[in-house]
């Protein structure tokens, strides 16, 4: 049977774009914690010695934006200029305005509408995806790239590899077989890690530590063989990193946030957006729908699309494709999805408890992926068992 190669990448929490996602979601958490009806569209950008938050926020919450920025950067590990940013001494710029009253009246009638009447915060289309190739019902390439990034951060923070610095990227290539539309991983073909490091460490030490402390604990032995290729800091030097190395911006890592290039993406980013923004809530509910189809044994692989018009509660369209892996026809699966899931934004927020912030609820989503996580706060990962009519 013919095989093919597919690749997914990830970046860890010290990457400048991911720093921005985490700041935006930390601000969302702070607003929702005090005022669950907060309307938040918060962007962040960063460059050497500077973090700026800007956007539209309407909330009754009292939020110290500067403190949130500094706390988030410090928590990631940006505590001195030589690691890429100094959380306590960098410039913090804030340019936050209120949500446009035009949007407010169209979406939630200035809070006068019932939940089922709340319109979508914008137009757009979102995709949810699931596959039976991993226990998380996520693509293996994406799962491994993401877990390598998380492990890099873990061994940095617990001092297993004290030479590590916060910024880093991973990439995994897997050889697959196509089994009647289902994706079956055969082996890991290539592992790539580029991580920021201090001045003292040699490239030999970097490669040895990454294999021992990052790759070996993450990638199951069954997928590795003598032909697996490793590229470990292939550029030869990565001392300058974080915002000092590259500018960062919220919403620049939308494939890493989702399915690693599998499925499809409507283009809307997640971080810094409250649940009336269907870019986020719509994508969460279609992940739940696709995952439920696969977990219920109705298909081995599934993609679901939903689309919206601004101010209109009901979705314009819902689409499903099981890549010819469905146990029943796709049209019957679509009927089950429509019966079991409410795609109106106000109802998604209630059913998935999306107005609850605080406790790093959204900030956690902003690094290492929004899907396939085993965490009670990720309510959209809860499966509904779908039963076709006998």
Swiss-Prot record:
EC number in record: 2.5.1.6
The record, for InterPro entries, names:
ADOMET_SYNTHASE_CS, S-AdoMet_synt_C, S-AdoMet_synt_central, S-AdoMet_synt_N, S-AdoMet_synthetase, S-AdoMet_synthetase_sfam
Residue ranges crossing the lipid bilayer per the database entry: none
Q: Which named protein is this?
A: S-adenosylmethionine synthase 2
Q: Where in the cell is it found?
A: Cytoplasm
Q: Which reaction does it catalyse?
A: L-methionine + ATP + H2O = S-adenosyl-L-methionine + phosphate + diphosphate
Q: Which Pfam families match?
A: S-AdoMet_synt_C, S-AdoMet_synt_M, S-AdoMet_synt_N
Residues recorded as binding K(+), renumbered to this chain, are 43
Q: Which co-factor is required?
A: Mn(2+); Mg(2+); Co(2+); K(+)
Predominantly, its location class is cytoplasm
Q: Quick check: keyword Hydrolase in the entry?
A: no
Q: Does the keyword Ribonucleoprotein apply?
A: no
Pathway annotation from the record = Amino-acid biosynthesis; S-adenosyl-L-methionine biosynthesis; S-adenosyl-L-methionine from L-methionine: step 1/1
Q: Which GO terms describe its molecular function?
A: ATP binding; metal ion binding; methionine adenosyltransferase activity
Q: Which UniProt keywords apply?
A: ATP-binding, Cobalt, Cytoplasm, Magnesium, Metal-binding, Nucleotide-binding, One-carbon metabolism, Potassium, Transferase
Question: Which positions are annotated as binding Mg(2+)?
Answer: 9
List GO BP terms, alphabetically.
one-carbon metabolic process; S-adenosylmethionine biosynthetic process
Question: Enzyme class, one word?
Answer: transferase
Question: Looking at the UniProt record for this protein, which Gene Ontology cellular component terms does it annotate, in alphabetical order?
Answer: cytoplasm
């Amino acid at each position: 049977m013919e095989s093919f190669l597919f690749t997914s990448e990830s970046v860890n929490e010290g990457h400048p774009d991911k720093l921005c996602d985490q700041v935006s979601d930390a601000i969302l958490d702070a607003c929702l914690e005090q005022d669950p009806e907060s309307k938040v569209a918060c962007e962040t950008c960063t460059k050497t010695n500077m973090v700026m938050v800007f956007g539209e926020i309407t909330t009754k919450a009292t939020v110290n934006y500067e403190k949130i920025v500094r706390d988030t950067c410090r928590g990631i590990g940006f505590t001195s200029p030589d690691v890429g940013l100094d959380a306590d001494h960098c410039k913090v710029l804030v340019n936050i305005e209120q949500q446009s009253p035009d949007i407010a009246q169209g979406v939630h009638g200035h809070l006068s509408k019932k939940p089922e009447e709340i319109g979508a915060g914008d137009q757009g289309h979102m995709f949810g995806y699931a596959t039976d190739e991993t226990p998380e019902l996520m693509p293996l390439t994406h799962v491994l790239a993401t877990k390598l990034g998380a492990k890099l951060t873990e061994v940095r923070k617990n001092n297993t590899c004290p030479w590590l610095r916060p910024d880093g990227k991973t990439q995994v290539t897997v050889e697959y077989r196509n089994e009647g539309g289902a994706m079956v991983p055969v082996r890991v073909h290539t592992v790539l890690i580029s991580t920021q490091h201090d001045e003292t460490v040699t490239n030999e030490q970097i490669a040895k530590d990454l294999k021992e402390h990052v790759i070996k604990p993450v990638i199951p032995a069954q997928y590795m063989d003598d032909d697996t290729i490793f590229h470990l800091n292939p550029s030869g030097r990565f001392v300058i990193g974080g915002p000092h190395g590259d500018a960062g911006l919220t919403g620049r890592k939308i494939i890493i946030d989702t399915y690693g290039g599998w499925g499809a993406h409507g283009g809307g980013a997640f971080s810094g957006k409250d649940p009336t923004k269907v870019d986020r809530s719509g994508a969460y509910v279609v992940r739940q729908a696709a995952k439920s189809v696969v977990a219920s044994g109705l298909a081995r692989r599934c993609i679901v699309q939903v689309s919206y018009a601004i101010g209109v509660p009901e979705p314009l369209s819902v689409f499903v494709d099981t890549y010819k892996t469905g146990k029943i026809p796709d049209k019957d699966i679509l009927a089950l999805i429509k019966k079991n899931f409410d795609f109106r934004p106000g109802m998604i927020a209630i059913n998935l408890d999306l107005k609850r912030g605080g406790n790093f609820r959204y900030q956690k989503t902003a690094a290492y992926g929004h899907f396939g996580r085993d965490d009670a706060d990720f309510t959209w990962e809860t499966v509904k068992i779908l039963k076709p009519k006998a």
